[in-house]
A protein has these predicted regions:
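Conserved small/aromatic sequence motifs within transmembrane helices
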Residues: 1-145
Length: 145
């Protein structure tokens, strides 16, 4: 399902889309597209707060795989698409355990794992790990080639 995802702006207007070799978004600490305030709200995950509106509207949940742009749907193998049946979340397995350190394929694999093992207990673990990850700013800016 397509929906507009709310976020605080953290990049300069008309910033170019910079991708790594694996197709994932560049999130380096030296990213020239990110504003000074943007660096702060990203490191503290405050840029995600507006997505609570998406949760209230029913487009997202608190926990689930992060939503991807629609033009990415054709890059998934058929057996990977299982995670697309799960409502996307503000935080998820990848954000809690890897934040920005997992490459594109690892993120897909982790989203598939979550979709196949979804449970209240796993969601509680993800929430607790997300809190720890945000408080200790783990894996915020990881440069991968």
């Amino acid at each position: 399902k397509s929906f507009p995802m709310h976020k605080f702006r953290s990049m300069k207007v008309n910033a170019p889309d910079i991708r790594l070799k694996d197709g994932s978004t560049y999130n380096g600490d030296d990213d020239p597209r990110v504003t000074k305030l943007g660096r702060f709200i990203r490191k503290t995950s405050l840029d995600e707060i507006p997505q609570i509106l998406n949760v209230l509207k029913g487009d997202m949940s608190l926990i689930g795989p992060r939503p991807d742009p629609l033009d990415w749907l054709d890059k998934y193998k058929e057996e990977e698409k299982v995670f697309l049946n799960v409502r996307p979340g503000i935080t998820g397995y990848n954000q809690a355990y890897y934040r920005n350190s997992a490459d594109a394929q690892e993120k897909i694999d982790n989203d598939v794992y979550y979709a196949k093992n979804i449970s209240f207990a796993l969601d509680v673990k993800i929430i607790l790990k997300t809190i720890k990850t945000v408080l200790y700013r783990e894996n915020v800016n990881v440069t991968r080639e």
